[in-house]
Each structure stands twice: as C-alpha cells, then as structure tokens.
C-alpha cells in the first residue's frame, strides 16, 4: 500500500517535530528496565522508530511494529527492523525480553504478547493526570488517559511497578506546535479537520512565550507488568 501524500506529510511531522518529545519517557523506561546489550525489545506502534534507536544505542536488539505505511517507511529509512504487524511467536529467533507500547489497542497487545518470553517486561504508557497535562483539547479530540492498570489486568499480566515522567512539549512556534500535535492522532476524531486545526492554534496561544516558542508541560505515566 502506497502512503497518500497527506499521510506522508503527517508522518514526517511526527518524525521531525513530535517524536522527540517522548524521549524522557523512553529513557526513563529503559533506565528502569536496565536495557542493555543482549536484550531483545519489541516496540508496538513505534512510529518512525526513535524509541528503537535509543534502545539500540544501549546495545539492545530492537524490532518495531507499525501499521501506518508512511511511518513504517521512515523507520526503515533509519535502517530499523519494523514489521507491519506483531510477529508470530514461532518467527522470532528467541522470545523478546521486553515490549513497549503507548496506549495500545487491546487486540494489538494481545497479538504481540506471545512473542515475549515468560517473565518478560511489558511496559504500557499513557497520559498522566489531566491536571498535570497542558496539551489542549478541542471539539473532537485531545488527550484521553486510559486506565493502564485495567489493561494489564485484562491482558492477564502480572503488575510489577509504575512511574511518572515529566515530558514537556516544546515547539519553535504555534505552527510547529499545531503540526506536531496533529501528527499524534489525538485530533483525528474531529468532524471538521480545518476547524480543529484553527481551534487548536487558538488554544495554544496562552502557552506561547514572548519569543514565539510554545511550551506545554506534561506528565506521562507508565506501568510495568510481567508475562505470566
């Protein structure tokens, strides 16, 4: 499937503007798990693959799963191994030691779990408390934190800790902020995309600094669980 021009532009906005905003989250999780040489990591919905690159820099063997063809192509441009769907347990040379996912769909998580070894770590992340996140909501979209503990329970995993990470979103200007935030998919539910874009730009003005930059402090939460 060839990505549409719109999908390609949105994917590039994700890779060039937005993806790096989550680096503090990725690094905190890797520190907590002590990711290093010899570890095998599987990243669900890996986007353009920055989280995989950070794991690889620590010596881990990282594989991604990304359904969007445009983002998958960008990740492969970075010479990363990225699949269109979760690997079958029998296809891996050996099971993965850890799985990382940001608010995954239950069916995607369920499909990936068989590839993780028994006792392996499963890390799920999402937005923190609404009062600690400043990313705006507009009609049709915005941050909607999920109950990660319930996701863990329903997936049959064993809880093994949690944490919170400060992830500020900083942008060069309002236009960059709008493009970056739209690339997250948070606002895809808006019935009028152009109107949502205008409302988002308006909602960002209170966070605009005198030099024109935009600063959005946010807290993200992650939970660690183990495959039984």
Segments predicted by a language model, with ranges:
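Conserved class I S-adenosyl-L-methionine
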Residues: 1-39, 50, 71-74
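A generic alpha-to-beta junction signature in SAM-dependent methyltransferases
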Residues: 33-35, 56, 109, 116-117, ...
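Conserved Class I S-adenosyl-L-methionine
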Residues: 48-50, 151-228
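Conserved SAM-binding loop
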Residues: 64, 101, 124
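Conserved catalytic/acceptor-binding region of the Class I
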Residues: 111-172, 188-192
């Amino acid at each position: 499937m060839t990505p549409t021009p719109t999908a390609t532009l949105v994917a590039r906005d994700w890779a060039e503007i937005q993806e790096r905003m989550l680096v503090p989250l990725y690094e905190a999780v890797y520190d907590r798990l002590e990711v290093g040489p010899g570890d095998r990591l599987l990243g669900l919905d890996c986007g353009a693959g920055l989280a995989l690159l950070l794991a690889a820099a620590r010596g881990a063997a990282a594989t991604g799963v990304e359904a969007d063809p445009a983002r998958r192509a960008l990740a492969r441009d970075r010479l990363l191994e990225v699949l269109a769907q979760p690997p079958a347990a029998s296809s891996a040379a050996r099971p993965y030691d850890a799985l990382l996912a940001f608010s995954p769909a239950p069916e995607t998580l369920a499909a990936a779990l068989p590839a993780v070894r028994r006792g392996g770590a499963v890390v799920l992340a999402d937005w923190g408390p609404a009062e600690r996140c400043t990313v705006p909501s507009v009609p049709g979209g915005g941050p909607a934190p999920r109950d990660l503990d319930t996701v863990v329970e329903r997936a049959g995993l064993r809880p093994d800790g949690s944490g919170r990470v400060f992830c500020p979103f900083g942008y060069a200007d309002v236009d960059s902020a709008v493009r970056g935030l739209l690339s997250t998919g948070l606002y895809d539910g808006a019935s009028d995309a152009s109107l949502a874009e205008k409302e988002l730009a308006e909602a960002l003005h209170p966070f605009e600094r005198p030099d024109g930059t935009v600063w959005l402090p946010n807290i993200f939460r992650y939970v660690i669980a183990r495959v039984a």
